[in-house]
Amino acid sequence: MDESADKLAALADVVRALDQLGASHAVVGGVAVGIRSGVPRATIDTDVAVRSTVDRHALIDALAAAGLRLTGTFAHSLNFRHSSGEPVQIVFDPEFDPMIDRAEPLDAEGLRIRVVTTADLIAMKQRAATDPARRRSKALRDQADIELLRGDVPDPDEGW
């Protein structure tokens, strides 16, 4: 993980580009877990779900204009690298479209972003955790995220 990568700058640039494109979107993944649970959480990238019907070529152009470099193309996602070094994954999944519609605008470090609801984030994490093809370490992280989202939040004043 690149310690100099700037998640907030990457997120700001991605959100601005998607808004200018008119692409419906919402923050998902570890960043969303941190925002929703109130517990900062290490994550290897920044994940943003975009409506599955978006024009991918227009999206690639918009993110490139915002300073992101395309690093991978997959059936349901595009991977980018922000100029700060932060990896960004844009996810296209028809099952996420209703979740994007239900996403709520929240303030995160002075940035107004749409984040999927806690209930939808738990559903996403449950789906991922039970995927037999998912790496075990990721599935375990998904299960821990579910518990955080359900309120099992550590008290900074509690002992071991």
Where are these regions (language model features)?
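Compositionally biased terminal segments of proteins
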Residues: 1-160
